[in-house]
A protein has these predicted regions:
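A conserved ligand/cofactor-binding region detector
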Residues: 1-263
Length: 263
């Protein structure tokens, strides 16, 4: 499969202008990553769609994991498509070093060997032509950052990996489903991420689910100034996919882990 690098770079420039009124040389690494990722997603869309259609009504395999560590997708995806060197050269010709994106955070969807193992299974399957789809949760804070306070104590900080956008996933609202627990109902919204096989001929899918509150904004509660209730309800629903492996030393923590494993 051949992908047009000039088109990808042109689309990246157009997206930078449209979204940020910037150019390749005036933008930030985060914005460049976001727009380049979107341009690549545009380029692979036909192949991704064809891969899905070719496997309709055929036997498929599914991989379930609590976590996935997919690595730096801008590099791995361009490499698997066979255009990493060409994109690097095209950016350099316009005064941009692709290495500037090396500090872009990985998708924080895991924190250990289990996540890397899951990613390796997906990579191996798609490169071998096996129709394997991955399923899991789309954590907002899958990992955490660490720092030391003034007393030298280690502190954990949230790692909001989607703060600058997530160009490698598509939200699929039409496939959202209700998940009913004994004491609450949430909406599970899927986000699809392409898993590109080496050579770019086949693309599988990693579908990650994000927990959200059902229904629309509660204006009645807002008008009566029950803002704490609104916030509490939101966190209770969205908290299921907030973080990987919540503290299970309390009853609430154990219940949250149970919800995650059954969602």
């Amino acid at each position: 499969m051949s992908y047009n690098v000039n088109t990808i770079i042109s689309n990246t420039e157009a997206l930078l202008k449209l979204r940020h009124d910037e150019t390749l040389t005036t933008t930030t690494p985060q914005r460049l990553h976001d727009c380049l990722g979107t341009a690549v997603m545009m380029a692979i869309n036909e192949t991704w769609t064809t891969s899905k259609k070719n496997r309709e009504n055929k036997r498929k395999a599914y991989y379930f994991s609590a976590e996935y560590l997919m690595g730096r997708l801008v590099y791995s995806n361009l490499f698997n498509l066979g255009i990493l060197d060409q994109v690097k050269a095209a950016l350099e010709a316009k005064g941009v070093d692709i290495a500037d994106m090396e500090d872009i955070e990985d998708a924080a969807l895991g924190n250990g060997g289990l996540g890397r193992l899951a990613a390796c299974f997906l990579d191996s399957a798609v490169t071998s032509g096996v129709p394997l789809s991955g399923y899991g949760l789309r954590y907002r804070f899958g990992l955490f950052k660490q720092r030391f306070d003034e007393k030298g104590a280690q502190k954990e900080m949230a790692d909001d990996w989607t703060h600058y956008g997530d160009p490698w996933s598509y939200r699929r609202d039409k496939h959202a489903v209700k998940v009913k627990f004994a004491d609450q109902t949430v909406i599970a919204v899927p986000y699809d991420m392409p898993i590109i096989g080496y050579g770019g001929k086949t693309i599988n899918t990693l579908r990650l689910w994000q927990s959200e509150q059902p229904g629309s904004f509660d204006f009645a509660a807002f008008d009566s100034m029950q803002i704490d209730k609104i916030a509490k309800d939101n966190v209770r629903c969205e908290g299921i996919s907030y973080a990987l492996y919540p503290n299970d030393s309390t009853e609430k923590g154990r219940l949250l882990r149970l919800r995650q494993s059954s969602a």
